[in-house]
Amino acid sequence: MYIDNELVIRPIEEKDLEKLWELTYKEESPEWKKWDAPYFEHKAISYEKYLANKDNIINQDDYWIIEVDGNIIGKVSYYWEHKPSHWLEMGIGIYDSHYWSGGFGTRAFTLWIDHLFNTLPLVRVGFTTWSGNHRMVKVGEKLGMTLEARLRKCRYYNGKYYDSIRMGLLREEWEATKFIMKM
């Protein structure tokens, strides 16, 4: 568990499942999906079907919830792009729109990056988004990440092409950024 005042990231517990399902899979077209890879299909699933997968959700290292004042607002996650070389990609979802543009994503990602560098033998963390998600690109910039790749016009959404954006951060850059942020 990592804490920044009223914001907490922590492993998912069984008591969190219903709220997490409501935020992520209860609706066919949730508002957050317009920003989180909307070019990939999203389907609502029943709570029963969601619970059938609970062993892959509860107390996992790669998928934690974000809480603000005890309310679940989203999740942070990671996956291995190539585990033998320690190439990890991370993600974040703020599902409750009341918490958009309030700095919660930046703060949660800060805690998550700390956690990843503190617990895994990584030299780099990164994420992939699309040029239509300006808030996510801004989070990367605020955290000192480098634009490592821009694949032009390869994402198609609502009749328009967008770029795929890949941002990354090296451990030594993070340590320098954290030092500057503390000053």
Predicted features by range, described:
Residues S29-A52:
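Conserved GNAT-fold acetyl-CoA-binding loop/helix
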Residues K54-Q60, M145:
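Short loop/turn motifs at secondary-structure junctions and domain boundaries
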